[in-house]
Regions:
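Active-site micro-motifs of SAM-dependent methyltransferase domains
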Residues: 34, 66, 109
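Hydrophobic faces of well-ordered beta-strands that scaffold small-molecule active sites
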Residues: 12-15, 34-36, 58-62
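Mid-to-C-terminal alpha-helical segments outside catalytic/metal-binding sites
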Residues: 78-114
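Divalent metal-binding pocket/active-site signature
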Residues: 1-30, 40-53, 67-79, 93-97, ...
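Conserved short-loop catalytic and cofactor-binding motifs
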Residues: 34-37, 72, 87
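Compositionally biased amphipathic helical and low-complexity segments enriched in hydrophobic
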Residues: 2-3, 56, 105, 114
Length: 114
């Protein structure tokens, strides 16, 4: 649909992707970005998708909280992002600091942050 409408697919961000495996592969192969949060990593399918997201297409979700009636302070968001980075790092067999630096670079690229 996005290609049909003329949108640049490489600027699409899938927020907490929960589609089928085939849809995931199509979106990944098209160069879409994927944002990940702790709740996504709580499921087997979510962890598998996170493992397969290319590092240059990975973002972390910052629209906390993922659950209603949970703490929404800046500190709780920072802790959640750190846990998410560590979990993704373990899935990808790399250091959490690498995940954090890649995500920061991706955010700068996607959102044209200077």
């Amino acid at each position: 649909l996005l290609k049909f409408r003329g949108f640049p697919v490489s600027s699409v961000i899938f927020h907490w992707f929960s589609g089928t495996s085939n849809e995931f592969v199509r979106a990944r192969n098209a160069g879409c970005y994927f944002s990940v949060n702790e709740r996504m990593l709580a499921t087997k399918r979510g962890r598998e998708y996170a493992r397969q997201i290319p590092l240059d297409r990975l973002l972390l979700e910052t629209d906390a909280p993922a659950e209603p009636n949970t703490e929404t302070s800046v500190q709780s968001l920072i802790r959640s992002l750190a846990r998410t980075s560590m979990h993704i790092a373990s899935l990808k067999n790399c250091d959490a600091k690498r995940i954090e630096s890649v995500v920061l670079a991706n955010a700068h690229s996607v959102f044209d942050l200077r």
